[in-house]
Each structure stands twice: as C-alpha cells, then as structure tokens.
C-alpha cells in the first residue's frame, strides 16, 4: 500500500458530497497515520468541510513530531477531532509483548501530552489476555487515574475493547434469528455503515 495524498482525500470528499452519501465522520488509520506527511492537511480539509475526524494512533514520536500542527487544528476545530490511542494492555509488559520493547513509556508520554492539551481522547485495547471485560476496564481505569487521563473506562465509546479474531477458527453463520436474539439491527453495525479507502503502490488513487 501507499500513503493517500491530500489530493486523493479531496477527490473522495468531493465524491461524498456529489453523491450525497450520509457521511458524518472521516477516520484515519494505518499503520501509523502520522507517518503520512499529508495527514495534518487531510485533517484540516475533512474538518473544514464539516465532518468529524478520528485518528487511530500509537501516540508515539510520529505524532509528537506534529504537535504544532495538531494544536493549530485543535484551536480551529476542537471537539470535532478525536484521537484514539492504541494501548494493547493496561500492563506495560503485555503491551510491549505486542508493540516491542521500550514502546510503553513513549506511548504514555504521547497520551499525557494529548490529555494535558485537552484533546478529545479515546483508547483502543485488546481482549487477548484471558481477563474479563470488567477486569480489563478496571485495569485501564487505574492506568488513566495514575496518569491524569480523563477517560471514563466504563464508556465503551471512550475505551473500545476490540474482540480478537482467529483466522484458524470457523466462524458461525449469523441468521436473522440471531440478530433478533441480540436485539441488534444488521444495518447498525460498522460494516454496514462504514467504508475504507486504501491506495495501492503505483495506483493513481
């Protein structure tokens, strides 16, 4: 894959408006989206057209290298911008087992910087640690409290605990009755309401 450019994003935003698609939020993910030098401009373009923007980041050096641009965007768009920081576990050793050694403290430093500057914050965690959701949320709550991070660990929109996917396991089919039992409408789940844009190397867009 290759990085999207500001021109790429502008064309897709034009298409959204031209087709009157019911889009309210533009999300940027990766890899690490802050590795893309065009990200601040793409954020400004998206927010300037009235969309909310969500960045999924590890909050490490690439993000901190763009502090000035982030503060400028925040000053103009405030609550319309959310940064969701990936913290794979509330325990440093487990987080580093996935992210690599010496990744915990840089992430915490980035998270604190975002909190200190009153950015709209969320956290994404994983559920691969053989602990209950309640235990995980209590662990993250303790982490947030210890670092002065104003995130409600009981709010599933602010602390998103993603289920694990095992490519080796068969996945049961979902029937209409399953949706009724769960009290969920199929049209409300993410894959029914979200679309991803990716750019292949060598492609125009």
What are these regions (language model features)?
Residues 1-14, 31-77, 83, 87-109, ...:
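Canonical radical SAM enzyme core domain
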Residues 16, 72-74, 144, 148:
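Conserved hydrophobic residues forming the short capping helix/wall of the S-adenosyl-L-methionine
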Residues 25-27, 52-54, 80-84, 120-122, ...:
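Structural preference for beta-strand elements that scaffold enzyme active sites
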Residues 88, 92-204:
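Radical SAM enzyme [4Fe-4S]-AdoMet core and its adjacent flexible, acidic
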